[in-house]
């Protein structure tokens, strides 16, 4: 995939960039997303059940604000453009946060003060973005990496900041209603790829695939762009692998059919056909000779089983 361009979205250039997103979405049907947020207020144990995981995610998303949202629009031809939307609702001094997560984001170059001062309001952005999605002709494929929280923040934004549904089943139904059926997690796709593991992070998978990052890690725009390229690479390789498997199966089937055909032809044409057993002939005896097996002047000797009268 060739990187075309990228842009940061602030309050002062929002109109121009939102129009650019609208125009690009006319030609692209896939969106890779990434979110940066203030971390988890309630951390979930590794061995937690799905219900507990959803309950904790709901609590975290309902009580925190997005900081950045990254979009990369792309299609099968590889055309792509990336946007990094800076959202102003998070106030480091007033809002709930995980201190370790905030320190981590700062260490990776996020300027939280600038985002707070020059960013776009979350409600304002999602109001415009929802309108753009309704104008899209055709279905959209959404791509993320370990994207439960990405999907959750999208649902929260697209529903006007409402709390997430009470159960994970209702949440999945809401995701399908808002985003459609085509939502792919690259981390899960990696499970099916040779040499990769679902335990790998995005950067490690990119390193294995020998892909260079564009921009800084743990910035929403850069992460979404890398997610799009990794997704394109993995799905392309899986498709080729499947085609090769089909060709191998077809070749094996062809060989089997050839063997069966040869065996059939040998059975029909090349195995010597046994000569038919001739019908017994009546024995002729010489009437004028002591030894009936010599001479002429023949008469028939009845043979049993040949409908002759004894």
Swiss-Prot record:
Endpoints of the signal sequence: none
Pfam families: CAF1 (PF04857)
Entry EC number(s): 3.1.13.4
Enzyme class, first EC level, given as a word: hydrolase
Top-level lineage group: Eukaryota
Residues annotated to bind a divalent metal cation: 34, 36, 150, 223
Cofactor: a divalent metal cation
Record carries keyword Nuclease: yes
Protein name from the UniProt record: Putative CCR4-associated factor 1 homolog 3
Lineage: Eukaryota, Viridiplantae, Streptophyta, Embryophyta, Tracheophyta
């Amino acid at each position: 995939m060739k990187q075309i361009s990228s842009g940061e979205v602030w309050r002062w250039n929002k109109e121009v960039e939102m129009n650019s997103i609208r125009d690009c979405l006319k030609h692209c049907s896939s969106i890779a997303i990434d979110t940066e947020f203030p971390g988890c207020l309630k951390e979930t144990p590794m061995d937690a059940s799905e219900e507990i995981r959803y309950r904790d995610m709901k609590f975290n998303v309902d009580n925190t604000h997005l900081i950045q949202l990254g979009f990369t629009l792309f299609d099968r031809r590889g055309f792509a453009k990336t946007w990094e939307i800076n959202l102003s609702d998070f106030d480091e001094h007033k809002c709930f946060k995980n201190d370790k997560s905030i320190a981590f984001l700062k260490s990776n170059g996020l300027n939280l003060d600038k985002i707070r001062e020059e960013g776009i309001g979350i409600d304002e952005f999602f109001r415009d973005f929802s309108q753009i999605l309704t104008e899209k002709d055709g279905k959209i494929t959404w791509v993320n990496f370990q994207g439960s929280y990405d999907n959750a923040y999208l649902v929260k934004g697209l529903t006007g900041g409402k709390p997430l549904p009470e159960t994970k089943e209702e949440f999945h139904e809401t995701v399908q209603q808002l985003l459609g059926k085509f939502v792919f997690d690259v981390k899960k796709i990696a499970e099916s790829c040779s040499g990769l593991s679902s335990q790998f992070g995005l950067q490690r998978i990119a390193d294995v695939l020998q892909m260079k990052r564009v921009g800084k890690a743990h910035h929403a725009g850069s992460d979404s762009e890398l997610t799009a390229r990794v997704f394109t690479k993995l799905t392309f390789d899986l498709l080729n692998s499947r085609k090769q498997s089909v060709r191998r199966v077809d070749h094996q089937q062809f060989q089997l059919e050839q063997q069966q055909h040869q065996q059939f032809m040998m059975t029909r044409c090349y195995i010597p056909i046994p000569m038919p057993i001739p019908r017994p002939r009546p024995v002729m005896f010489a009437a004028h000779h002591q030894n009936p097996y010599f001479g002429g002047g023949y008469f028939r000797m009845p043979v049993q089983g040949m409908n002759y009268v004894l």
